[in-house]
Amino acid sequence: MAKQPSDVSSECDREGGQLQPAERPPQLRPGAPTSLQTEPQGNPDGEGDRCPHGSPQGPLAPPASPGPFATRSPLFIFVRRSSLLSRSSSGYFSFDTDRSPAPMSCDKSTQTPSPPCQAFNHYLSAMASIRQSQEEPEDLRPEIRIAQELRRIGDEFNETYTRRVFANDYREAEDHPQMVILQLLRFIFRLVWRRH
């Protein structure tokens, strides 16, 4: 059976907060509206906080929302979830387990990065250095343009030369039909060799 809000004796944590007896809410009949508001007691600021200001649930703590099982009850307006209460998968509250603290964030000044992170950082720095080395100074740019033009001229020459040689070999091969077959086999062999 689920524990009622009246069974909870305090909302303050174990850091010196004083335990206060639980107040029993007035009983509502089953058909009564659940949107009744109660006056907050104990804190004149109107925050409804019964814990001392030094506790984690002090005046700056966000208000806890009722759980999904508490909102089904007509008394859900009196339920306030505490940090001491944890809920198992069945929805019942228990005091047995404590919530684990949030994991600490990575302090970049004291912690070394993980090996994958180190490898990725090394890759990024290597790529940055390659980009910097590809940016040549202005005094080398004319030589690079000349080299690119010479390469283009060489590529054009190779393209026209291979066409002439292939055309001449084909004309000579017309005289010898076996040479046509050998030239085609050689071409197929080169094509297959390049694909592997």
From Swiss-Prot:
The keyword Mitochondrion applies. It is a peripheral membrane protein. It is found in: Membrane; Mitochondrion. The keyword Acetylation does not apply. Expressed in a number of B- and T-lymphoid cell lines. A motif (BH3) lies at residues 146-160. Induction: By ER stress. One of its GO terms (molecular function) is protein kinase binding. Induces apoptosis and anoikis. The isoforms vary in cytotoxicity with isoform BimS being the most potent and isoform BimEL being the least potent. Belongs to the Bcl-2 family. This is Bcl-2-like protein 11.
